[in-house]
Amino acid sequence: MSFKEMPLMSDKKGIVLFYPYIPKKSFSSLKNVLSGRWIGQGPMVDKFEKKFSKKFSNNHSCVATGAGTDALHIAYILAGLKYGDEVIAPVYTCTATNIPFLYMGVKIKFADVDPTTMNISIESVKKLITSKTKAIVCTHYGGLPCDMDELKKIASKNKIPIIEDAA
């Protein structure tokens, strides 16, 4: 089945929010994984991490996580966020974007979204940023990228990281 054969909207089903696409060439690999005895970490995960690291990272190893929330939590820790810090995050996002902040005791300042893209509003970020802001979190909603050029300018000016939630 090709992507063109999977309509995102139909008269019978309405708008399909999550329509998994698994190419037929992946079926045998999936069967091997699912029929294997490894539930979590295992040989296929090791292979994936190595291939991903080689393709997307120069000097760093990549770590596969069980969920996007786990990956974001790790990213927030690696960004140096700690109890009492303040971050700016979009008001419209999956709860997974912000749940780790609750574990960590990080204060969230919610930025409005641009109604045409549903991504974080640059103007809202500019209004919310203070000397207490330790990071900006953005979510690329529905596969539509945020205005990273503008966010990078703000982050650079304030010497803070941007953490992108692309899940």
Identify the residue ranges that each predicted region occupies:
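N-terminal "arm"/small-domain region of PLP-dependent enzymes with the aminotransferase-like
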Residues: 1-39
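Histidine-centered beta-alpha loop that forms part of the nucleotide-sugar donor binding/catalytic region
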Residues: 92, 106, 113, 167
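Phosphate-binding glycine-rich loop
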Residues: 38-86, 100-104, 110-112
